[in-house]
Amino acid sequence: MTKRDQSLATPYLQFDRTQWAALRDSVPLTLTEEEIVKLKGINEDLSLDEVAQIYLPLSRLLNFYISSNLRRQAVLEQFLGTDGQRIPYVIGIAGSVAVGKSTTARLLQALLSRWPEHRSVELITTDGFLYPNKVLNERGLMKKKGFPQSYDMHSLVKFVSEVKSGADHVTAPVYSHLIYDIVPDGNKIIKQPDILILEGLNVLQSGMDYPHDPHHVFVSDFVDFSIYVDAPEDLLQSWYINRFLKFRQGAFSNPDSYFHNYAKLPETEAVKIATQLWKEINGLNLKQNILPTRERASLIMTKSANHAVESVRLRK
């Protein structure tokens, strides 16, 4: 099979790092090194070069898509003879635990909000739509947190549907990784943003992933552009363990932390527990429920060591 035949056989355009970086064009870097440090995750080496070569071209592409969507809305309003109602553009970001979804989401929020159009960009994680621990315990699902059955999908779909319908304000519950639970009365209010970034394990899932709870509309039905952050499983496991060890030295030392009892563990024991958690929960969820959604994404970013993106696939 020739290279052209291989290209025609896939629904994606494929770029290596150099090819993708060239698509930045002349987009200026609007973030300082200090701001990037604040945006990056606990376990990631995020450089100015990474932002310039990977995330600036991505923000440029998204800006084109968003502008095109606004023009399409204007055409519809002209046809209907109606005044414009602001309908948010929804970007979904999916991928495994520890792959760096949150950093990608925060970076895009910062970059997209600094385009000349000064668009308002809100960020919501689907963790907020996990059932509270009390419910998960009652249903025997604490070891399935993050699996499809651990989410209140009806509430999540209702939230995204209301945002996408242009509701004045919509309320989302907030999840705390410190207490490992939904924050009581910790709701976040979303007020008609131009862009909503929805980050979570499950934003690309569909009816096939929820046979236990059949319903006909899914989060993916409301997503305008979706990104899957990918990496080999051996790297994901290593990043998860390293993140666990850093939390053990930091967040776990807080007496309010759900995992406070892990703070004083010897490192060898902590590695053993983190490895077990990966194999029994996160790695299993990746194989069964997350990885199968990858090819539904509009764009796939594949990372190598040190969280550096080595290739990008963009749906044709």
Swiss-Prot record:
Which amino acid positions bind ATP, per UniProt?
A: 95-102
According to the UniProt entry, its GO molecular function terms are: ATP binding; pantothenate kinase activity
Q: Does the keyword Flavoprotein apply?
A: no
Keyword set, alphabetical order:
ATP-binding, Coenzyme A biosynthesis, Cytoplasm, Kinase, Nucleotide-binding, Transferase
GO BP, sorted A to Z: coenzyme A biosynthetic process
Subcellular location, record wording? Cytoplasm
Q: Where does this chain mainly localize?
A: cytoplasm
Pathway stated in the Swiss-Prot or TrEMBL entry: Cofactor biosynthesis; coenzyme A biosynthesis; CoA from (R)-pantothenate: step 1/5
Catalytic activity, reaction form:
(R)-pantothenate + ATP = (R)-4'-phosphopantothenate + ADP + H(+)
Any S-S bridges, and between which cysteines?
A: none
Of the GO CC terms on this record, one is:
cytoplasm
| Highest taxon in the source lineage | Bacteria
- Which EC class does it fall in? transferase
Instruction: Give the matching InterPro entries.
Output: P-loop_NTPase (IPR027417), PanK (IPR004566), PRK/URK (IPR006083)
**What EC designation does it have?**
2.7.1.33
- What does the similarity note say? Belongs to the prokaryotic pantothenate kinase family.
Would you tell me the protein name for this molecule? Pantothenate kinase
Q: From which source organism is this entry?
A: Yersinia enterocolitica serotype O:8 / biotype 1B (strain NCTC 13174 / 8081)
**Name of the gene encoding the protein in the UniProt record:** coaA
